[in-house]
């Protein structure tokens, strides 16, 4: 295990019947980082987390957690976990759940500290079973962090949350990293990864396609985003071979293209009234699309 890594999968294979979930996956979470794991549905993200946590065993390859087997109690006591599917006793109040889970850890946060950090104090005395779906996710997050974890696993934590609740969770995650926690986060929200991640890992069909900073991931793709005001129609521009897609945003067209220089030349040659022309590098969304296409 790399000395800077807290959790690591090495050449891990996992099948469920005839379905290949992981196909030689190598993945690690480094000390002090927030790692965002991206991938389409069925890419193997949840399976990878489950093996790192010792909930599943790999068919081939190895998993380590704090340099130990994931099944070791000493390793597990340094974790916080929030999976996609969570069952908690519906009759217990949120504060009671936090206190119960905190009692398993050697140096936990108090229930009040956990709720303060996650802004869930208004849920403290409510039975878990009476909460909405989004409120349950917020309560699960408070429970996941109450043990003051060195490593926090969050599997699609913001699904079902409104924008304000998502931003509250983002703020809490930044605070946890500042306090010394490392975090593995899976998400479908690319802006979440772009905003939070120190490093991004892209998984498709059970394989690691690439990993790096957001800027490094963007550099993998040749696409650029062009915005302009033009008299040309969407249909005219979409017909150009370098153009992947075109959309209108208020008075401007937004064009995603390979070979942006050729598209700019065409625009200038075709429309004397062209205005507000700007060219931007690809965002994480374009990079993600291109990288996962390679696995198709």
Regions found by a protein language model. Name each.
Residues 92, 221, 241, 267, ...:
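Short, flexible helix/strand-to-coil boundary loops that buttress conserved ligand/catalytic motifs
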Residues 108, 180, 243, 271-274:
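A generic structural signal for alpha->beta connector loops
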Residues 170-258:
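ABC transporter nucleotide-binding domain
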Residues 65, 70-71, 98-105, 118-120, ...:
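Alpha-helix C-terminal capping segments
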Residues 10, 229, 249, 278-280:
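Solvent-exposed beta-strand sheet faces enriched in polar/charged residues
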Residues 258-296:
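C-terminal coupling/interaction segments
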Residues 4-7, 14-185, 190-204, 210:
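ABC transporter nucleotide-binding domains
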């Amino acid at each position: 295990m790399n000395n800077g890594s807290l959790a690591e999968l090495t050449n891990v294979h996992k099948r469920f019947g005839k379905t290949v979930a992981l196909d030689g996956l190598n993945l690690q979470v480094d000390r002090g980082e927030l790692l965002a794991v991206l991938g389409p549905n069925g890419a193997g993200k949840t399976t990878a987390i489950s093996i790192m946590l010792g909930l599943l065993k790999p068919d081939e390859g190895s998993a380590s957690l704090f340099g130990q087997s994931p099944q070791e109690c000493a390793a597990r006591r340094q974790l916080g976990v929030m999976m996609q599917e969570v069952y908690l006793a519906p009759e217990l109040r949120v504060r009671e759940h936090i206190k119960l889970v905190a009692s398993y850890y050697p140096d936990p946060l108090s229930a009040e500290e956990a709720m303060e950090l996650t802004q869930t104090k208004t849920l403290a005395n409510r039975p878990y079973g009476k909460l909405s779906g989004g409120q349950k996710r917020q309560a699960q997050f408070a429970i996941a962090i109450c043990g003051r974890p060195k490593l926090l696993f969050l599997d699609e934590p913001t699904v079902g949350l409104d924008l304000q609740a998502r931003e509250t969770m983002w703020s809490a995650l930044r605070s946890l990293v500042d306090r010394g926690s490392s975090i593995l986060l899976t998400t479908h929200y690319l802006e979440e990864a772009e905003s939070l991640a120190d490093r991004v890992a892209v998984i498709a069909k059970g394989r690691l396609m690439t990993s790096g900073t957001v800027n490094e991931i963007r550099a993998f793709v040749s696409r650029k985003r062009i915005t302009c005001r033009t008299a040309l129609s969407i249909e005219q521009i979409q017909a150009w071979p370098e153009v992947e897609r075109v959309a209108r945003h208020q008075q401007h067209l937004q064009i995603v293209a390979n070979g942006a220089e050729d598209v700019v030349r065409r625009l200038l040659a075709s429309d004397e009234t062209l205005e507000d022309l700007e060219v931007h590098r690809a965002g994480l969304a374009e990079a993600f699309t291109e990288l996962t296409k390679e696995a198709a």
